[in-house]
Amino acid sequence: MDDEYMSLEEEEDNCYPSEFDDHDQMCSNAEESDLQHSREPTSQVITKEALVAAQKEVLVKVMEFLSVTENQARTLLIQYQWNVDKLFSVYTDQGKDVLFSRAGLTVFDPSLTKKTMKCDICMEEDLSKYAMTRMECGHRFCNDCWKEHFTVRINEGEGKRIRCMAYKCNTICDEARQLVSTELAEKFDRFLIESYVEDNNMVKWCPSTPHCGNAIRNIKDDGDVDEVECSCGLQFCFSCLSESHSPCSCLMWKLWKKKCEDESETVNWMTVNTKLCPKCSKPIQKRDGCNHMTCKCGQHFCWLCGQATGRDHSYSSIAGHSCGRYKEEKVRQLERAQRDLDRYTHYHYRYKAHIDSLKLEDKLKKSILKKAVLNSETKDQKVFKEYSWIIDAVNRLFRSRRILSYSYPFVFYMFGKELFKDDMSDEERNIKKNLFEDQQQQLEGNVERLSKILEEPFDEYDHEKVVEMMRHLTNLTAVVDNLCKEMYECIENELLGPLISGIHNIAPYRSKGIEQAAEFSASSACGSS
């Protein structure tokens, strides 16, 4: 054990930058970095039961500010995607008439109400006032026609914005529940409640499968990409609702997933390793050194040029056939396909290797926690009672391993020519690629060292050896944290920062991991929700 740690100390000069000598300073820097990104929770979990309260608080704010009914407030908020600041801005800058008009609201003028009790839809006359219903716009029709209108719209999924039946009236009718069956009324209310999530850019359903029923609300309305953890345990990107994929941008991750799932690389492999039969066009793979090929359909052809030939041949030639001119474009196409295939294989292999390591280390984490708990109960040493150091190390391993895995798709697109062909010269691309891969390699080496130390049977060590292991793990954990931080700074400032396009923003690095969304409480709701 001691000899092993001596060798580790000898390696530290190569793996540890000099500024990492002061461990307390490193931990302080990591905490300060997290505080810079978030001093308060930036997201909230809204349970299915709390959705009504979350929606109600925003409705009340609009109702009080504009002196409108709940129905009118909801219609306005749906129009402006539940963005109260935007709604108030339109009201302040352009007035109430413009605000109402855009949302399909009409101020009721009693003088325009017809005196006759006739329904202009079914043309039935002499109806009692109890058989007719007037909407906020002032238009009045019989209850049967309203019921039919509401029933059709609700069943067609248009319950959130049911317009008045009157000709050219765009007023939104919100009184459906009083005129339809109990079942449809519940469905209508569900549409209105869910609109708080589905029409709201700052609130999204947790993408868990099966669905946990929670929604996540982004408190800070700054447009930045962020990652969040729902109370159900799922971590995901709030912007694209995919799994957490930082340091990849949402577009990079979307393209990478598609590339891994579709047949683009299979096509490249087929181009490199097979030739199409000139008769039936089926792909043929070469298995030996002879250039004479025979398809199952009976067609003979030359492997080198793909042209149809006769049957007679020797190992070195085919009777009556000589390959034509050098087909430069076909050769270039073949070389390009081979190069693309090799490049994709290189990055995918490393991405997959780290994903597989994460799965194995999940078992390691459970084993370590079990050992730590058992030792804290059976041993009297202080170090076993306080084993947060090893939990911190395991969590750091998981966070850094995941960052490493997603850094390979990032490199694939950052330094390829699919997205940034015109953003960098070849020379600049190579320089930046080498610098980034140096950082990536340094992080990778320290992550593997962290993983190796965590595999040690610390539960079998005496007190002195455990203290020594704790010291090494604590230092290495801080090193890995700082390397992750430096990688993100490089990506944000040196790689993505100079680009003109702003579509490749990434979620910020957080030393303590992805933020767990706070529990929603009505008093904490903000106006821009």
Swiss-Prot record:
Q: Where does Zn(2+) 6 bind?
A: C302, C305, H313, C323
Q: Which residues bind Zn(2+) 1?
A: C119, C122, C142, C145
**Cofactor, free-text remark:** Binds 4 Zn(2+) ions per subunit.
Q: Where is this region: Disordered?
A: 1-23
Q: Where is the signal peptide?
A: none
Identify the cofactor(s).
Zn(2+)
Look up the record and give one Gene Ontology term from the biological process aspect.
ubiquitin-dependent protein catabolic process
Kindly give the PANTHER family that the UniProt entry links to this protein: RBR FAMILY RING FINGER AND IBR DOMAIN-CONTAINING
Family of the protein in this entry: Belongs to the RBR family. Ariadne subfamily.
Write the protein's name. Putative E3 ubiquitin-protein ligase ARI4
Q: Which organism is it from?
A: Arabidopsis thaliana
- Report which gene this protein is encoded by: ARI4
